[in-house]
Amino acid sequence: MDLFAKFENQLGPIGNEADKVPGYFSFPKLEGEIANRMMFQGKERIVWSLNNYLGLANHPEVRKADADAAAQYGLAYPMGARMMSGNSNNHELLEKNLAEFVGKPDAMLLNYGYQGMVSAIDNLVTRHDVIVYDAESHACILDGVRLHAGKRYVFKHNDMEDFAKQMKRATALVEGTPGGILVITEGVFGMSGNMGKLDEIIKMKDQFEFRLFVDDAHGFGTMGKTGAGAGEELGCMDGIDLYFSTFAKSMASIGGFIAGETKILKFLRYNMRSQVFAKSLPMPLVLGNLKRLELLRTKPELKEKLWHNVRRLQGGLRERGFDIGTTNTPVTPVFLHGNHDLYETTQLIFDLRENYHIFCSVVMYPVIPKGQLMLRLIPTAVHTDQDIDETLNAFTEVREKLDNKTYPRELPPIQSVAAAATV
């Protein structure tokens, strides 16, 4: 049998519908300056789908730093992996500043966040070790766990009773062996907006022996007094053995870092395959990230504006009776309960985008249980009160249409809209 034959009629739950909704629900094109309002299909929309939490993507100081660095160095310098020929004083300065910011002795730059996490997990454990991880962990964690040749146990999301149960299993398994236990969770979960119970997990170190690895992609820059993340917010940063974040969210950039004890970071620097065998972060990104970190540290008003918008948006949704779960972070899920199928889902999103000019992410099966529908909003520092008020009014109206079964049982006329946008 041809290896590729299995892909002819089975493209996955989303890919199977690709021909019905190309360029609209999947692979949409947002155009113009990265902002609270952007162009989609030829019309301006309020955009709630970008993780530009602090508005740094188009901050004038950031744009200047990026442009100046690109003009001076181009995109190629430095060439090669860090360990061979791709290191620089600026790479090391960024690592030093990141370590100081999150209160760790050392930090290591990653040329990309997702594969950095995958590679780090692969590098930290052997077949003798056991991984214990949260059930709602991000895909980069799940992919890293899949590479593990030893045992792995998953605990129910933020369920400390089940965590203790899995830790007992893991402890029994490594007893009398050269193996140890790596616990992996998130500081802020990107779908639900829940914070990981880092403080409670760390307290369990009194009962179990393990090391804690935290992915704080959504917490870095948004949580804690200074923006140093979920560990700072919960007052337990010292108990996090390895702290990870990408630059793709609050920093609005590319790359990432891991922070922790110097001896562990030294091991990763010399052994982490995604860094040892790949080109280092280009200089414009390094200098641009230095500027972004500087603004994150020196302009608290950016985080204050973000949280003004978070409170206004989430408070307004709750006042109108929307279920936004138990989020206590900027990530804002809106759950629309009922037995919603593909037709209702696509009609609702089409209505929001075409008639209310609102662009947000939609999440459905298999990410959440079948029949449910979740709209995910990411408020940022560049959103306005008007953006929020228009969105609240729109959500109230489309929910009423959904409840009254107003939407037709067919796919929306996306092709006609797309054709009009190209005229």
What positions do the PLM features span?
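Conserved PLP-anchoring active-site segment centered on the Schiff-base-forming lysine
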Residues: 120-139, 160
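Active-site phosphate-binding strand-loop segment of PLP-dependent enzymes
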Residues: 153, 157-214
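Active-site PLP attachment segment
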Residues: 232-267
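Conserved PLP-binding catalytic core of the aspartate aminotransferase-like
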Residues: 26, 303-311, 318-356, 372, ...
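Conserved N-terminal alpha-helix of the aminotransferase class I/II PLP-enzyme fold
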Residues: 64-112
